[in-house]
A protein has these predicted regions:
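Aromatic-anchored segments of alpha-helical transmembrane domains
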Residues: 37-41, 118-128
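Hydrophobic alpha-helical transmembrane segments
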Residues: 80-97
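Short, Lys/Arg-rich, polar N-terminal cytosolic tail immediately upstream
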Residues: 1-22
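N-terminal signal-anchor transmembrane alpha helix
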Residues: 20-52
Length: 168
């Protein structure tokens, strides 16, 4: 039986490269998630202002998944909703970054993979997260139209994540 053993120096070099690669992937994912979270706010703000709602109730709406109607009272709902908003953009970006680092085809198809990521996030939120939460809205706040929310997830969340992660 022929086994090849790496010297301690070679093992250390391999481990360092692995840690550096993972660190770079996580940094890109975090950057992409924060950027996409900010980018998403632009069309959301425009659409909500056009509907006479504003961005504060949109963030409170996100917080209502954990707080129920209490999310619409005071600043706690706004703060928690904003944190949840960025959580929902950072986690998929980190996952996408890990997949893209293992499957180079994902980076080559970023213009397709990004909107697909947005679809996945949209449907995951709608099918898994929201039905199992305390999500609620007062009569004065109506959720964003379905198609608008879907397109925002595809092109303001998924696409920026894929393009930022694709950059070398």
């Amino acid at each position: 039986m022929n086994t090849t053993h790496a010297t301690p120096g070679e093992q250390s070099l391999h481990t360092t490269k692995s840690v550096d690669g993972l660190s770079r992937t996580l940094t890109k994912g975090l950057t992409a998630g924060v950027a996409a979270g900010l980018i998403v706010l632009v069309p959301v703000l425009i659409l909500q202002l056009a509907r006479g709602i504003g961005v504060v109730p949109e963030m409170q709406l996100a917080a209502s998944s954990l707080m129920g109607m209490a999310a619409y009272e005071g600043a706690a709902g706004l703060i928690l909703g904003t944190l949840l908003h960025f959580f929902v953009s950072i986690v998929p970006a980190l996952a996408y970054g890990l997949v893209a680092s293992r499957l180079p085809v994902v980076n080559r198809l970023a213009w397709i993979a990004g909107p697909v990521l947005g679809l996945i996030v949209f449907f995951f939120m709608g099918i898994v997260v929201l039905p199992h939460s305390a999500f609620t809205t007062p009569a004065s706040v109506s959720p964003m139209p379905y198609v608008a929310a879907l397109l925002i997830h595809m092109f303001a969340l998924g696409l920026p994540i894929s393009l930022i992660i694709r950059r070398r």
